[in-house]
Amino acid sequence: MIYGIGTDIVSLKRIIRLNKKFGQAFAGRILTPEELLEFPQAGKPVNYLAKRFAAKEAFAKAVGTGIRGAVSFRNIGIGHDALGKPEFFYGPALSKWLEEQGISRVSLSMSDEEDTVLAFVVAEK
């Protein structure tokens, strides 16, 4: 059963501006420790940041909380399965919160074009 859906669209120009203004502090605010290790090797660092920002915002919309409490940028991670499909991983506090809400699966789709990134999330009970 669908618990909620969320979508987010991010302008790459916005992420470029934020990254220039705040530098590593911006990445440190939105990326998990695991993502911070991957970030320097990303082929397109701005796209890497933008996709994760959009995915985490869409996640927060799908679960209905916004970014607050256990649903924080640093508790929501994005990785890929063996076939390259994007998937979420969670910090302990968020894992516990999802279990308490009865949310058993959260699916993610992301896409990017020249100047825009899109993330779409479906949370299921």
From Swiss-Prot:
Keywords: Cytoplasm, Fatty acid biosynthesis, Fatty acid metabolism, Lipid biosynthesis, Lipid metabolism, Magnesium, Metal-binding, Transferase. It is an enzyme of class 2 (transferase). GO terms for biological process: fatty acid biosynthetic process. GO terms for molecular function: holo-[acyl-carrier-protein] synthase activity; magnesium ion binding. It catalyses: apo-[ACP] + CoA = holo-[ACP] + adenosine 3',5'-bisphosphate + H(+). InterPro entries: 4-PPantetheinyl_Trfase_dom, 4-PPantetheinyl_Trfase_dom_sf, ACPS, Ppantetheine-prot_Trfase_dom. GO terms for cellular component: cytoplasm. Its cofactor is Mg(2+). HAMAP family: AcpS. Belongs to the P-Pant transferase superfamily. AcpS family. Transfers the 4'-phosphopantetheine moiety from coenzyme A to a Ser of acyl-carrier-protein. This is Holo-[acyl-carrier-protein] synthase. The gene is acpS.
